[in-house]
Amino acid sequence: MMLNLLQYPVIKTPKATRLLENNQYSFDIDKKLTKPQIKKLVEEYFNIKVLAINTHRPPRKIKRSGSAPRSKRVIITVSANINLLG
């Protein structure tokens, strides 16, 4: 099932906390997912309309050279009256 590819919400960083005020939510996801797949997954799971998706791969830690990041971080923008986490 594709739901296993959506790992967890990111709310522990200061930037992610600021983004919540703008109706943007951060998630760590499987690094192989594309933007259309992410949009379909989020819209079906949360039953909402996604306005925009931004993705990036966080830099890996210096201590662990030789290994690629295991996840991709995605920022999902939704309508003003929707709350995904509450």
From Swiss-Prot:
The lineage of its organism: Eukaryota, Viridiplantae, Chlorophyta, core chlorophytes, Trebouxiophyceae. GO terms for cellular component: plastid; ribonucleoprotein complex; ribosome. GO terms for biological process: translation. Keywords: Plastid, Ribonucleoprotein, Ribosomal protein, RNA-binding, rRNA-binding. The keyword ATP-binding does not apply. It holds the Pfam family Ribosomal_L23. This is Large ribosomal subunit protein uL23c. Binds to 23S rRNA. Part of the 50S ribosomal subunit. One of its GO terms (molecular function) is rRNA binding. InterPro entries: Nucleotide-bd_a/b_plait_sf, Ribosomal_uL23-like, Ribosomal_uL23/eL15/eS24_sf. It is found in: Plastid. Belongs to the universal ribosomal protein uL23 family.
